[in-house]
Regions:
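An N-terminal assembly and electron-transfer interface module characteristic of large anaerobic redox
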Residues: 1-309
Length: 309
């Protein structure tokens, strides 16, 4: 047994949890959105109420992961509804399962890990509801090192890590041109070209969704984190096969609280490019959001049972 996929509704119980502990394999619980595919696509909620608790929350008690919307209702020739996998999502789910299985056999020294942290602009501290983010992140990196992950160049202390983050992994205000110029000289950012960005966007975003990005932010690279030759800078701190990245602002404006906790506008190119670089440029095997929260869970529309972008 390499993985378990459960398409039922609710918990399987403590006996199943004991079984999972013995076999030590990932347990997936893909979602049935319980309505016509078109209605689910147009619904801003995705899933709520009893279906949310029974399809997402209770399976997670058993250890289920990846609540991926996979099944929907369709109308047959007899005008009766039937359940089937959504064709454009089935391949993604299968690839996800195979990726998890592959990680079990890949040496830790070869695994590539991306860790996002939330941080305010400039010299603001990394935040997570009172948690000591810097020391906690450093302890995680030490544990990864002990487990055989490649963290070459990791500083000797948490203070050294924080200095590296302030130098290479900062978040800038829109008008902090002097700080940005210094960052470009000394911060060792990843640079995303228009060709790469366009290629990654085509793989990831639906054309109509990307047009919302362009309408809100202009054409790539936009006005923020852009270089004179038309590239987009991605702040990152890399130690071997582990990269730390700040979560960029999910919108524009001076109200940082509103930008983080809810904006209806499409995110800027910087926000999208960072995640696309992590996936396609850095080729991360694992992505972690470290801390209590950032802006990801406050982005517009569906929060669970997400549709394709």
């Amino acid at each position: 047994v390499s993985a378990i996929i459960n398409m039922a509704h609710g918990r399987l119980g403590d006996a199943f949890v004991d079984y999972l502990k013995r076999v030590n394999v990932p347990f997936f619980a893909p979602l049935n959105v319980n309505r016509l595919e078109k209605k689910w696509e147009s619904d801003n909620m995705g899933m709520n109420g009893g279906f949310l608790s029974q399809s997402v929350v209770t399976p997670e008690i058993d250890g289920a992961l990846r609540p991926f919307a996979l099944f929907a209702h369709y109308v047959g020739k007899d005008d009766l509804e039937y359940v089937a996998a959504m064709p454009e999502r089935l391949g993604t789910f299968v690839q996800t399962v195979n990726n998890y299985i592959g990680l079990k056999h890949k040496p830790n020294s070869q695994k590539r890990v991306a860790i996002y942290y939330y941080k305010g602009p400039g010299q603001n501290a990394m935040t997570a509801g009172g948690m000591e983010v810097g020391p906690s992140l450093y302890n995680l990196l030490l544990r990864l090192k002990q487990e055989g992950y490649n963290v070459a160049g990791l500083p000797d202390s948490a203070e050294g890590l924080m200095q590296a983050i302030q130098r290479q992994g900062a978040v800038f205000n829109l008008y902090a041109k002097g700080a940005f110029d210094d960052f470009m000289k000394n911060g060792k950012p990843a640079l995303v070209s228009k060709n790469d960005y366009d290629s990654w966007v085509k793989k990831t975003l639906r054309p109509e969704k990307y047009q919302e990005v362009v309408k809100a932010n202009g054409e790539f690279p936009g006005e923020f984190m852009a270089t004179p030759d038309g590239k987009l800078a991605v702040a990152r701190v890399q130690f071997g096969n582990v990269v730390l990245l700040p979560q960029n602002a999910a919108g524009k404006g001076d109200n940082a609280f509103q930008i983080v906790h809810g904006t209806d506008a499409a995110p800027p190119h910087t926000y999208i490019a960072s995640y696309l670089w992590t996936q396609y440029g850095f080729k991360a095997d694992v992505l972690i959001h470290f801390g209590t929260h950032g802006s990801l869970e406050f982005t517009p529309k569906k929060q669970v049972a997400l549709s394709n972008l």
